Amino acid sequence: MKLSHTLLATLATPVAQGLTLGSRNQAYSIIREPAKKELLQDLITWDDKSLFIRGERALMYSGEFHPFRLPVPSLYLDVFQKIRAMGFNMVSFYVDWALVEGKPGEFRADGIFSLEPFFKAATEAGVYLLARPGPYINAEVSGGGYPGWLQRIKGILRTDAPDYLKATDNYMANIGAIIAKAQITNGGPVILFQPENEYSGASVSPFPNKKYMQYVIDQARKAGIVVPLIDNDSYPGGTGAPGTGEGEVDIYGFDSYPLGFDCFQGGSYDPFGGYGYDQCYKLVNHEFSRVFDKNNLAAGVNIFNIYMIFGGTNWGNLGHPNGYTSYDYGASIREDRYIDREKYSQMKLEAQFMRVSPSILEATPGDPSTGVYSENKDVTITPMLSNKTGNFFVARHTDYQRRDSTSYTVKLPTSLGTLSIPQFGGQLTLSGRDSKFHVTDYPVGNHTLLYSTAEILTWKKLDGQTVVIMYGGQGELHEFALQNAMDVHHSSSSQLSYKQSNSSVIVQFTATSEHRNSAYNYWVPVLHKGNSAYGSSVMNPETIIVNGAYLVRSASVGGKTVSIQADFNQTTTLEVIGAPKGASELSINGKITSYKKTNEGTWLCNPEISFPTVKLPNLRSLDWHAIDSLPEIKPSYDDSRWTKANHTTTTNPKGTPLKTPVSLYGSDYGFNTGNMLFRGSFVAAGNEDQLVLTTSGGQAYAASVWINQTFLGSFAGNKNWATVIVTHAVPQLRAGGRYTLTVVMDSLGFNENLTPGNDDMKAPRGILDYKLHSSSSAGSDPTPITDWKIAGNLGGEDYKDKFRGPLNEGGLFFERSGFHQPLPPLDLFSKATPFDGTAGAGITYYTAKLDLDLPADEYDIPLAFRFDNSSAIAAPAYRALLYVNGFQYGKYISNIGPQTEFPVPEGILNHNGENWLGVSVWALDSNGAKVPGLTLTSRPPVLTSRNKVDFIQGPSYSKRDDAF
């Protein structure tokens, strides 16, 4: 539809822990007296309405992305470009302290834990950063980001206890200095810094502990942080808000979880035994985004962070007990970086509209109302009014959970008076879980939309015309009016009516079924300004508009050439709208591409697109080898190198007083990750018939018990139980005989430490209590168990694999020996497969070489390992650890679930060469266990313009002389 030569309106049809900062109708404004705040720099400033970046008022549309959950630095740019393509301009990120200071005093942020590649990728994509290093982060990671050795700190965590503060100093000094170098003042992408995280309540006085918060702030400032400090209260309680004195930040914000998840909200975490992330996504999907994201924007939110935008993976034991390996989160970008979820496209519509609507930052939010702007009280409308720059009205169902359709009309104030809309008659429609932005007096280039009920994706001022992309739901009637008279021309396929007058032109149309979701196909890449991907401005920068690709990563103009980086998942026609004057050549992914120019001035082309047939190896056909990974129960086993459990007291307040003669808590001996084994010795009285054992490993953990080589039984796990007391029947023992008790258990991470004072993170992992006795001999003393020893990851906090970090390896025999690394010593193994399994309880480690030959230079082909779970209910329970090239990338629990598919990113997997696959099988009952099926799967290939992915070449097997 062409209006005169000045407006080109393209009609299209479209169809959750987060940070919400600066809501202008909440009790706490961004800052009470911003003009009186002493700034340490002048590039990032603010007032009571928004941030300014280099003097430009900016709405920050942000998504959460944790680099530690994607240990392939060459993939950071891929994720950043996908976020930038949505119209977002910022990313928030946590740093996991536990990964960079596994041993007290030894800070290591190199290799895959280095932040410099993350900062570089953000800059290359044109994305600003909000840094959130804690020291406490929550984030559904083990200990909430606290390293396990903090269990030995006597002082209360997240307070001004001197030993706790001292423990944080090394980390905060080092990580603060790294982030400081990446601040915008040094040419980097970091524009905001958050000290601490969700510090919102406590079970200990005083609260808030202002001395503690000020200490964390001082740590950041001493490290060189000069950008504004922000807060994220768990709820709008005002903790640390500007004007509250010691411990106050510059900018106050709070979390918002509309659906009540502990998980503003881009998805949800999912616990062991949960429903799976695809089900989480259904609850917090594109419809959720339409309603709740727009509601936040209508409230005047101007720093808006979606948690998560990309979740990633809890690889290498980094997760907490209430979450499994996947941290997909039901986010807009899948764990494997695929962007086929509709929420991705819906958020793109919203963010792109905000980017071309800087006037919304000058508007004043009003209260949600019924019966004011619409006579239908089933519709609530929230106004955002401005005397200068346009008005915004967000319409939603009064009952936001309503799923049926509601018809309504509106009465909206305009510069020509209050108008009843649609003026041509008819009804607007709210279809199910939906909300809409209606605008009045909205500027588009040199023109003004008097009003529009259709939503706006973007607009662009061109030479001699202005392009506006509008959209509405299938079958919906919409109407817009342009101020000033102009001629109307439209294509014959457009179903519309219009009316002209001396003051305006009114256009009404109905979105048709053949245009369903076509708005999702539009991309608005920001044109580089010089070498800067940030473009000409933050709000409404110079762009072009591209229609038709799976993804448009970037666009630039050099001389006469328009260059576009795009990805394709199918053959398509590509349309380029807004090629600059003087441009005559089109390059797509580095190839000059011919095009046809339409009557409207757009370019149409058909890029060369083809897709390979992906052939993956059958994992059953690999040359598998196996080794017993529980030699500890054999009579000949030598445990002389084990750590003696000889602490008769503990500094852990959550485990005090001890119920055992010596501490059997893993962290008391430096074992903070993965499986642990315990061995104790006793002389039998001959009448023992019960072993009562109390263990603690976090929700869904398991434990198995042997006396010598006799299997007593297992606790196979429960999704709700972090600690359990199990009574095991003991077979007849020979009086005077010496026996060895062996306990194998897994730790699924430390608890988070959300409430200061509870010290939940210090809940110990290990054996809490035991009693070996005769149940029929009342009052008799239990049999003493002595000479306790404990085994965890080799070296404990002096962990062996510095490359893969302090959490990747647990304490099983194959892990201590390094057999999970590439090129293990197969001469020590025997031929066996996980599909055949074992006949009895125990642990077996299987390994095989996996060769791949995929066209990775041209195609992005996400891969995943899938365990067959079809017989999990009837089959014996087992647990499996999945290792890929030395990285632990899966914890499979057959009897609890829900995860059966484990994505492994390219870079961890070598898509063009040799890989080493490892699977440990822990059979939890006497019937043994086998893996019914394990397959390597792929998503459909995407023809990609991303940068080459570098293979993470970690250390291969080398004999560990101190292994046992």
Can you describe what each PLM-predicted range is?
Residues 1-20:
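Fungal secretory targeting signals
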Residues 163-239:
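Active-site neighborhood of glycoside hydrolase catalytic domains
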Residues 18-90:
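N-terminal carbohydrate-binding accessory modules
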Residues 338, 344-912, 916, 922-964:
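Non-catalytic C-terminal accessory domains or segments of carbohydrate-active enzymes
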